Amino acid sequence: MKEKNDTTIHSAVINRAISYIFDHVDEDISVDDVAKHCSYSKYHLMRLFRENMDEALYQFIKRVRLERSAWKLKVEKERSVTEIGIEYGYSSSNFATAFRKHLNTSPTDFRKTSEQLVEQSSFAHGISLDEIEDAGEQITIEHLEPMLVVYERKKGNYHNLSAEWCAFIEKYSDLATEDTLYIECTIDDPSITDENSCMFELCQTIARNHPALK
């Protein structure tokens, strides 16, 4: 049984389902599609998903789709609300209804207030949007060659990342070398997604010829 404070999603099949949903969230995917991808019966997968995620599989798909659309509304301001809704499988009226039901505001109003939502998020720790934009000027993008990693996908708020990293590095210290890279993937926007539903991944590169792989 999963410990109460354990944020790691341990089940391989659940991780496979989540990855599939993330990769195809802008397509018209169903629970049947996810189950087929995982080679599980629909009802068995639905039961496992709820046990591991405390959320119904269908609701997870719907939530991720709406929250990704909300993120697009924030960052792709040159695109219309209707265009973004259609990208995620909604007609104009259906998008507004589903969006309001989940986020308690209309897509149009959300876009207008998105900057304020960023600054109000507890994850922002009092940082203003101007400060965030200034920091963005110092960010560089580097393209890396494909690499082998050991990783853990976790669910929970981002406030304890330092402790999560310490535990992760200690757990996989036997796999580390002087060339090891540590990579963090924060998947959700905590100004949109409930903090306890946010996901992140901690990754550590591992040499392909490492003895542990033989």
Language model: regions and residue ranges:
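Basic, low-complexity segments
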Residues: 1-4, 32-53
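Short, Lys/Arg-enriched, Trp-marked, Pro/Gly-tolerant hinge/linker segments that flank
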Residues: 1-16, 55-56, 62-63
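Residue-level marker of regulatory loop/turn positions in helix-turn-helix DNA-binding domains and
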Residues: 6, 10, 23, 38, ...
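Short, N-terminal intrinsically disordered low-complexity segments that are rich in Pro/Gly
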Residues: 6-7, 28, 154, 158
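Basic, amphipathic alpha-helical hairpins
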Residues: 16-29, 49, 71-79, 99
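Small-residue (primarily alanine) positions within well-ordered alpha-helices
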Residues: 17, 35-38, 69, 85
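A solvent-exposed interaction/effector surface
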Residues: 43, 48, 55, 59, ...
